[in-house]
Amino acid sequence: MPPSLPCRCQEAPTPVFGYLYQIVELGVMRLFVEKRVFNEIPDEGILIADLATKTGIEFNLLERLVNFLISSRIFTSSSPGYVHHTPTSKYFTERRAQLWYPHIFDTFLTSAVKWPEYFDINGMQEPQCSSKSPFGFGSGYSDKSVYEIFDLMPKRSSDFNATMALSMGEMPILGMYDFSWIGEYGKRPEVKDRTLFVDVSGGKGQALQAILEAFPSIIPEQCVLEDQEKVIEEAKLATGPLETVKKVPIDLFGEQPVKGALVYYIRRVLNDWSDAEVVQILRSIRDACAPDSKVLISENLLPDEPPLKLAAIDVWMLNFGGKRRNKGNFGALARRAGFELSSIAEDDKTKSAVLELVVA
């Protein structure tokens, strides 16, 4: 269980000073994560002078920054010149925190500092496409999507992929939707040549593998894994149930190459894109559908009155041109693309869901 975060902003003489305390803390924490300062503090504490030697940071600079974090109760001190961990600072020695915090900090603040200028140019409206996003504008690539930008930054791209891999377990694959009907349908002799399941933009097949293992009646040879060509090349090395799955490179916004499949499954993809782009993705699938095809969208759902965490994530995703969506949002986008929303299977704990679309 992560520790609660100490906050002294309520002690500020004015709200503006409260935000100043928070801004300074955010910046110092970002630097200390980058320089691995938290990892160099032993459980018994350390002299700031010795910590300066271990980290290679000038003593005068380190003392000022550490003193602030002692004042803000991120650190504690037994006597002047000493610094000790608290549960909060100790948490930032963990790999998960060291990946997530810089990712959130860098992508949000790079964007937010440019919000006034971005919205002056683009109007006070949601980003209309991922290649015209606040993050791209703030990063100096105003015509590129976040994925195109990360391709230009190998270290950031590597850190991003590692961060996303950590979050895979936060959104369940199984336990919401009953996939067993797909395997039962596949037992019919007349459909032995039909594609049963297409995992659209499915990465290396983690979700598809979990589904095939949980529902062994679904025949792998009648399944397809799709993603960008470079991802598919890696996926071809898979063993186990994925070994005999067809691997097909795609352009997510181009023509869907697999026609007439029983199910098109798209997980953790649509929330990364604007409404117009989601409609484009779904229409490309709609054009490939048979009359009885279904589309399964596995995504996080935004409640009509979202709690603070989900509302914050939604605003953060705005920077990339994406958004968290509620049931009504998905229903409206489905209709624009030529589908009807037929059912929703939800996980109340994680606010995840599988939305089933049928051809309208």
Swiss-Prot record:
Keyword vocabulary terms for this entry: Methyltransferase, S-adenosyl-L-methionine, Transferase
Biochemical pathway: Secondary metabolite biosynthesis
Protein's GO biological process: methylation; secondary metabolite biosynthetic process
Classification via InterPro entries: COMT-like, O_MeTrfase_dom, SAM-dependent_MTases_sf, WH-like_DNA-bd_sf, WH_DNA-bd_sf
Residues reported to bind S-adenosyl-L-methionine: S201, G202, D227, D251, L252, R267, R268
Gene3D superfamilies: Vaccinia Virus protein VP39, Winged helix-like DNA-binding domain superfamily/Winged helix DNA-binding domain
Disulphide bond pairs: none
Class of enzymatic activity (EC top level): transferase
EC number: 2.1.1.-
GO molecular function annotation: O-methyltransferase activity
Cited function: Methyltransferase; part of the gene cluster that mediates the biosynthesis of varicidin A, an antifungal natural product containing a cis-octahydrodecalin core. The PKS module of pvhA together with the enoylreductase pvhC catalyze the formation of the polyketide unit which is then conjugated to L-isoleucine by the condensation domain of the NRPS module. Activity of the Dieckmann cyclase domain (RED) of pvhA results in release of an acyclic tetramate. The cytochrome P450 monooxygenase pvhE then catalyzes the oxidation of the C21 methyl group to a to carboxylate group.
Family: Belongs to the class I-like SAM-binding methyltransferase superfamily. Cation-independent O-methyltransferase family.
Matching PANTHER family: O-METHYLTRANSFERASE ELCB, PUTATIVE (AFU_ORTHOLOGUE AFUA_4G14580)-RELATED
Protein name (record): Methyltransferase pvhD
Source species: Talaromyces variabilis (Penicillium variabile)
